[in-house]
Amino acid sequence: MAMRIRMYDNVAQYLSDKEAIDAAVLSVLESGELVMGPDVRALEEEFAAYCGTNYAVGVTSGTSALLLALRALGIGEGDEVITVANSDIPTSQAVTLTGAKVVWVDIEPVGCNMDPDQVEAAITPKTRAVLPVHLHGVPADLG
């Protein structure tokens, strides 16, 4: 017997705490400090404490987060980064912005995530990172 799993309902989640969400968004918009303001600073401090670290940096997009992570690893010109071919553009864009070459691998047929066998076959002396993407709520096989 097949089990039906409901999709995540963004509207229901929003409506469950609408007043608090609206107040927080309005406060940030009215402050004019969307990126580097006190609310972001507070979030960074709370997140760092939650993670048990001294620092956390909030960024404006997933692309920026990926780019910072790749740059922190020293990835750049002449390097290769392996990622899955069926990801969205920002994954490959972040790699390209470092000057590194994107090496795409295909998916495995069950979870539609990167195929570990293809990752292994794609590794060269220039490979500096493997950038998995966990699609559709299914974690990629990192083993």
Predicted segments, located by residue:
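Conserved PLP-binding active-site segment in aminotransferase class I/II-type PLP enzymes
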Residues: M1-A72, G76, L97-T98
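PLP-dependent aminotransferase-like
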Residues: R71-G143
